[in-house]
From Swiss-Prot:
This is Methionine--tRNA ligase. Keywords: Aminoacyl-tRNA synthetase, ATP-binding, Cytoplasm, Ligase, Metal-binding, Nucleotide-binding, Protein biosynthesis, RNA-binding, tRNA-binding, Zinc. Belongs to the class-I aminoacyl-tRNA synthetase family. MetG type 1 subfamily. The gene is metG. Signal peptide: none annotated.
C-alpha cells in the first residue's frame, strides 16, 4: 500500500496571550490524528506558527515598553514550551513574522492582482479621536447588525457567525479608549470574493467538505444556487500604524492579519522544507497529489472555507483537501471563568504537577468528528482517568509483569500467544483505525476500554496470584502472564496516539521496538525478555484539581489579605449603618456592568477612569478611587456592580456617570486594600441587582 503524503495544520495561536485548555482541545485533537497517521506509515508533516501581526500586539508591546518583535519572541517561547509539555508534535513551529511569510504574502497578492481579483476603493473607517488612529476590527465593539447581539467585535459576530465591516456595527465604541469613534475615509485593498469565478469555485469545493455542519454553513453563506451571490469582497488591508507586512507599492498600507495568518501555514512548511530538503512546490502546487488538512475552531470556519481556498485557487496553489472544525470547551458546564478558576492555562496545569496525558486522554474520550461543544467535567475527569487508565489499562501490566520477571526471567511463553483473546484484540484494529482516521476518538477509546475489560476478565478468571502459589501450575501461570502482557502490548498500540509518553514507557518495559500499527501483527518474543515493571502513571488526586483551580482563581488572590484583616478582630469591622426601609433601598438602582476599558488618570494617584457597558447600547464613563488596588490591565473584561442612577458628577478630570462599588476595611491605613464587587460569571451587563 502506497504511503499517503499529508500536510496538517492547527489554527495559529495569537501572540498576545497564554495558551489555555480551550486552545489545547484543538492541538490535542490534531496531534492524535497526526500521530495515528505516522503510526500507519504515512509521510506526515504537522506545522504551526504563532500569529504575530496586528494592532493588539503593537499596543501591548507599547504598553509594556518593548518592541513588538521582543513581545512576539517572548510569547513564541512560552507557546512552544506549552505545546512541548502537552506532547504536541509539530514538525515545525514557526512565526508569521518571518521572511518566508512576507515573500509568500507578496507572491499570492500579486498573483491575485494579476487575475484582476484585487481592487481598490475608498472606505469610511472608524477613527479613535483620543488615540489618533484608525481602529482595527477587534478594537471596535458594538451590536451585531444582523442579530443584535451586544459586545461584538468589528469584523464578525460570535453569536450568529455573520461577518461585516466595522461601520455596520450599531452603537460602536473604541475598545482602546472607550471613546465613540468618528468616521474617516481611507483607500483600502479588497480581494474580490464576489467575482463569479470565486462563487463557482466555492460551490464546487464545498461539496467535498467532510462535516455536514460546515457544508450547511457554507451553503448559507453562499446563498441558493442561481440567485444573486451573497458573497462580499474582503478588505485585506489596514492603515498605519500597524505591525505587519507592508503591501507592495502601497506605502502606509499593510496586509490585514487574516490574510497573512493562513499563509503562515505555508511559510512554516516552506521553512521546514528548506531545512529537510522537501520539494515545497510538489506539496503545495496546483497539481499536488499530497493531502492538506486544517484543524480549526468553528468560530473561524468562514475564513478557512471561503477566503483561504479561494485565495489559494486563484494564486496558483492547491486547495485544502478538507477543513475539520471542532466546538468550544466548557468547564463543569459553563464557560471558562477566571473568578471560578476554570480559565485554566497550560502552564498552570503543568506547574501544579498535573500529567498532560490525563487531559489528552479525557479530551480524546469526548472528541468526535462533529462541531459540537465538549465539556470538561472535573469530577468526571478524575473518575475517568483513574478508572480507565489506571484501574483498567495499567492494572493489567501491574498484575502480570512481576510474576513473569521473577518466575520466568521476563521471557514469554510464545506458544501461549495463540490464545483467542489476542485474536479478538487484533480483529478490532481495522475498526479502531477507521475511528482514528475519522476523528471519532470517543468511539475509539470506548472500544479500547471494552477490549481492556475483556483482558481484565481474562486475568480475573486465570488468577495468576493464585496460580503462583502452586508450583504444579507453573505452566498455566506462565501462559496467563504471557497472554496478559501481549494483550497489554496490543492495547498500548491502540492508545499510543493519545498517550505517547506512557506508550514509550511501555515499549521500554516490554523491551520492544517503537510500536506502530504494523506491530499489531507481531508479538512479544522470548528472545527479548520483559523488564521489571515500573509505575507507568499515577492517579489523579482531587487535591491537585483544587490546587489547579486555586492557581487560576485570580480574584481570590486579592481577597486573601481581606480575609486576614477580618480575622484580626471586631475592631476592624465597620459598624452597620442605621436601618433603612425597603423603599429607601429601592431608590438605588444597582446594575451589573462590564469594564470594557480602563486607564490611569493623569494628575491623580488615586483615580482610574473606567469605561463601562451597562447593556444600554452605549458606554458610561466612571471615575473610581481604586488605583491603589488595581492596574488598568487587571480590570478590563471584569464584571462589577455600579450605582446606575447616581446623578452624574462633574469632576476635575471629566464627567463621572455612576459609582463602582468596592469593599474596604473601616481603617484603611491599618488594613489597606480596596476590592471591587464581582458578580457571578453568569450575570450579564445591565442585569439589576435586587
Amino acid at each position: 500500500m502506497t504511503a499517503r503524503r499529508i500536510l496538517v495544520t492547527s489554527a495559529l495561536p495569537y501572540a498576545n496571550g497564554q495558551i489555555h485548555i480551550g486552545h489545547l482541545v484543538e492541538y490535542i485533537q490534531t496531534d492524535i490524528w497526526v500521530r495515528f497517521q505516522r503510526m500507519m506509515g504515512n509521510e506526515v508533516y504537522y506545522v504551526g506558527a504563532d500569529d504575530t501581526h496586528g494592532t493588539p500586539v503593537m499596543l501591548r508591546a507599547e504598553k509594556e515598553g518593548i518592541t513588538p518583535k521582543q513581545l512576539i519572541d517572548r510569547v513564541w517561547t512560552e507557546h512552544k514550551r506549552d505545546f512541548d509539555n502537552f506532547l504536541v508534535s509539530f514538525d515545525n513551529y514557526y512565526s508569521t513574522d518571518a521572511e518566508e511569510n512576507r515573500q509568500l504574502c507578496e507572491k499570492i497578492y500579486l498573483a491575485l492582482k494579476a487575475e484582476d481579483l484585487i481592487t481598490e476603493r475608498d472606505v469610511e473607517q472608524f477613527y479613535d479621536p483620543v488615540k489618533n488612529m484608525f481602529l482595527p476590527d477587534r478594537f471596535i465593539k458594538g451590536e451585531c447588525p444582523k442579530c443584535g447581539a451586544k459586545d461584538q467585535y468589528g469584523d464578525s459576530c460570535e453569536v450568529c457567525g455573520t461577518t461585516y465591516v466595522p461601520t455596520d456595527l450599531k452603537n460602536p465604541y473604541s475598545v482602546v479608549s472607550g471613546a465613540t469613534p468618528v468616521r474617516k475615509s481611507s483607500t483600502h485593498f479588497f480581494f474580490k470574493l464576489s467575482d463569479p469565478r470565486c462563487e463557482t469555485f466555492l460551490r464546487e469545493w464545498v461539496a467535498d467538505l467532510a462535516q455536514p455542519e460546515a457544508s450547511n454553513k457554507m451553503q448559507e453563506w453562499l446563498g441558493a444556487e442561481g440567485e444573486a451571490s451573497t458573497l462580499s469582497d474582503w478588505d485585506i488591508s489596514r492603515d498605519a500604524p500597524y505591525f505587519g507586512f507592508e503591501i507592495p507599492g502601497a506605502p502606509g498600507k499593510y496586509f490585514y492579519v487574516w490574510l497573512d495568518a493562513p499563509i503562515g501555514y505555508y511559510a512554516s512548511f516552506k521553512n521546514l522544507a528548506e531545512k529537510r530538503g522537501i520539494d515545497f512546490d510538489a506539496w503545495v502546487g496546483p497539481h499536488s497529489t499530497a493531502e492538506q488538512y486544517h484543524f480549526i475552531g468553528k468560530d473561524i470556519l468562514y475564513f478557512h472555507t471561503l477566503f483561504w481556498p479561494a485565495m489559494l485557487r486563484f494564486s496558483g496553489y492547491r486547495t485544502p483537501t478538507n477543513v475539520f472544525a471542532h466546538g468550544f470547551l466548557t468547564v463543569d458546564g459553563a464557560k471558562m471563568s477566571k473568578s471560578r478558576g476554570t480559565f485554566i492555562t497550560a502552564q498552570s496545569y503543568t506547574d501544579t504537577g498535573m500529567n498532560p496525558e490525563w487531559l489528552r486522554y479525557y479530551f480524546a474520550a469526548k472528541l468526535n468528528a462533529s462541531m459540537e461543544d465538549l465539556d470538561l467535567n472535573l469530577d468526571d475527569f478524575v473518575a475517568r482517568v483513574n478508572s480507565d487508565l489506571i484501574g483498567k489499562y495499567v492494572n493489567i501490566a501491574s498484575r502480570a509483569a512481576g510474576f513473569l520477571v521473577k518466575r520466568f526471567d521476563g521471557k514469554v511463553n510464545e506458544a501461549a500467544l495463540a490464545n483467542p483473546l489476542l485474536e479478538q484484540l487484533r480483529q478490532a484494529a481495522p475498526q479502531l483505525a477507521q475511528y482514528y482516521e475519522g476523528r471519532e476518538y470517543s468511539k475509539a477509546l470506548r472500544l479500547v476500554m471494552e477490549l481492556t475489560d475483556a483482558v481484565n476478565a481474562f486475568v480475573d478468571t486465570n488468577k495468576p496470584w493464585e496460580l503462583a502459589k502452586d508450583e504444579s501450575k507453573r505452566d498455566a501461570l506462565h501462559a496467563a502472564c504471557s497472554v496478559s502482557l501481549e494483550a497489554f502490548r496490543l492495547l498500548t498500540i491502540y492508545l499510543k496516539p493519545v498517550v505517547p509518553t506512557m506508550a514509550a514507557g511501555v515499549e521500554r518495559f516490554l523491551n520492544v521496538d517503537p510500536l506502530d500499527w504494523r506491530a499489531i501483527d507481531k508479538q512479544l518474543s522470548a528472545d527479548r525478555p520483559v523488564q521489571p515493571y515500573q509505575h507507568l502513571m499515577t492517579r489523579v488526586d482531587v487535591k491537585q484539581i483544587d490546587a489547579l483551580l486555586a492557581a487560576n482563581r485570580d480574584s481570590l488572590q486579592a481577597a486573601a489579605p481581606a480575609a486576614e484583616a477580618g480575622a484580626a478582630g471586631a475592631s476592624a469591622i465597620e459598624p452597620v449603618a442605621d436601618t433603612i426601609t425597603i423603599d429607601d433601598f429601592a431608590k438605588i438602582d444597582l446594575r451589573v456592568a462590564k469594564i470594557v476599558a480602563c486607564d490611569k488618570v493623569e494628575g491623580s494617584n488615586k483615580l482610574l477612569q473606567l469605561t463601562l457597558d451597562l447593556g444600554e447600547g452605549k458606554t458610561r464613563n466612571v471615575f473610581s478611587g481604586i488605583q491603589s488596588a488595581y492596574t488598568p490591565e487587571q480590570l478590563v473584561g471584569k464584571l462589577t456592580v455600579v450605582v446606575a442612577n447616581l446623578a452624574p458628577r462633574k469632576m476635575k478630570f471629566g464627567m463621572s456617570e455612576g459609582m463602582v462599588l468596592a469593599a474596604s476595611a473601616a481603617d484603611e491605613k491599618a488594613n489597606p486594600g480596596l476590592y471591587i464587587l464581582e458578580p457571578h460569571s453568569g450575570a450579564v451587563p445591565g442585569m439589576r441587582i435586587r
